[in-house]
Amino acid sequence: MKKFILLIILIPNISLASDGIWKGFFDINGHGAYDFTAIIDKNNIYAFTETAKTICLGQIEFPKDEFKTNLDMYILDGTKFSTAVIQGKVIENAMSGKFVTQPAVDTGNMYLVNINNKVISTKEKLGNSPWIGKNNKTDIKISFDNDSNIQGSDSNNCNYYGRLSALNNFVYNVEIEIASCGTSDGFYYGMGY
């Protein structure tokens, strides 16, 4: 009887394994511990920090067990004020790295953990359940139908209409229109979870 051994080597694709939601913190020039949430789909990254009131958009690469991202940084009204380069290591479900901004040349450290196991998979139906949130002093109520359409309103009588579509198992593409809301009226695009 002849016997043989079949050896299979699995090499994970870091890029695919990195899709999803990453949460953690960073410091600026050694000060603070600021919150940071990154939403990643393939090479696209949308990130935000509530405490620093900043939104970041950019590209991310995963060469081997490392990552590098180039981000444009915006204040909440959409005005671009800076760029950042973040580089570091990916170890299992964590990213740890250093960043530098331009033109201010602020530096800092960042640590993020993948939280895909704590978010609702895009494979699950959101179906007809209201979602309630609060933004500053504004109460927001939004519902999703079984076809991933968005409809809602808030306590300022603003109306929300739009659509979700799954980008991967944890991240949605979000297209939303805000109406009857004065200067906030318009079409907005981004990613969400």
What are these regions (language model features)?
Residues 25-66, 133-180:
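N-terminal glycine/threonine-rich, aromatic-flanked beta-hairpin/loop signature
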Residues 18-36, 95-139:
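Tryptophan-anchored aromatic micro-motifs
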Residues 69-85, 171-191:
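An anionic, turn-rich surface loop/hairpin at beta-sheet edges
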Residues 60, 87-90, 162-167, 189-193:
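Extended lipid/amphipathic-ligand handling interfaces
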Residues 3-13:
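Sec-dependent N-terminal signal peptides
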Residues 54-61, 79-82, 106-111, 159-163, ...:
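A short, polar/proline- and glycine-enriched secondary-structure boundary/capping micro-motif
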Residues 56-100:
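Mid-chain, structured segments of secreted extracytoplasmic proteins
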Residues 20-32, 46-48, 70-83, 88, ...:
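Long, low-complexity, polar and repeat-rich extracellular regions
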